[in-house]
Amino acid sequence: MENYTKSTTMCGKRKPTFEIYRESDFSKITNQGTVTAFDIISNKETFSESKQLKKAKSRNVTLVDKNTKADKRYKSEKLSDYLLNQEHHKNSPKIINDVLVIGKSDGLINSFPLSQNYISSSESQTSSGNVDIIGNDNSHASPYLPKFELKSQSQSNHSNVVKNQPIKLCKKTEGGTNLDHNKSINGAVKSGTSKSANKDRIYVFYEDEEVMEYRYIFGSRMQTKNHDINANNKRKIFYQNSFSNFHLLHKIIQPNYEPASAEERKLCIEILDEVLQY
């Protein structure tokens, strides 16, 4: 996990702790095996590197920022700032489309659509509707399991595939019905004709084992989580508000979403800060 949480310094400027990949390289990432929580995927170029820095790097020239001090500690650019900064990153992806779980244990790889709701099997929480337990037994299942709303199939956007198989891509029609479940992302990118092969997609990956250890999905990446009082309080709050948080998170990532009130806007910011913190 240390490889993903530590930033590397280059030419006096820190790189982001998360990496950006193009969707065409999606198959390489899924087979990599060690992808920790909240690693963001879209294209391989880290956006903290400017064109001037790239040219200097190719010429083996070290650039020093005139406005920086030797003792100044640099911070990585936040993903939220990166998504909102359209002037400097016109071609950057703007929407987080999906959250996926890469599980190390034998069983299924679970695709967590943000439009679904989740409950904790370890805390024996109950909720209205059917709960589909994924995996051969509860030990291989994530503590947050998708609740499939059978009455609203048009809103479902989940895809469960066997490990080491390509992640399946659901292509939506105008009516919202999911089609072509057998078309993999890799195949859609190669064909170049599929509408679902969107180059501006961002995929957020986290490990199933990490979720089981932290007991909640979206949280700060603190190494001393089990000994931190604030982290324990956040964990309890997330247990109580998991339904509303996931529902609101799904609304936040919509491009035309506007908060209905100041309280909702404040909650949106808190959730985004929690999800995008690294």
Swiss-Prot record:
Disruption phenotype: Causes severe chromosome missegregation without greatly affecting sporulation itself. Reduces recombination by 16- to 76-fold. GO terms for biological process: meiotic DNA double-strand break formation involved in reciprocal meiotic recombination. Induction: Induced by transcription factor mei4. Keywords: Meiosis. GO terms for cellular component: cytosol; nucleus. Transmembrane segments: none annotated. Interacts with rec15; the interaction is direct. Interacts with the DSBC complex component rec14. Required for the formation of meiotic double-strand breaks and for the segregation of homologous centromeres during meiosis I. Interacts with the SFT and DSBC complexes, two subcomplexes involved in the formation of meiotic double-strand breaks. Stabilizes the SFT subcomplex on DSB sites and recruits the DSBC subcomplex onto DSB sites. This is Mei4-dependent protein 2. The gene is mde2.
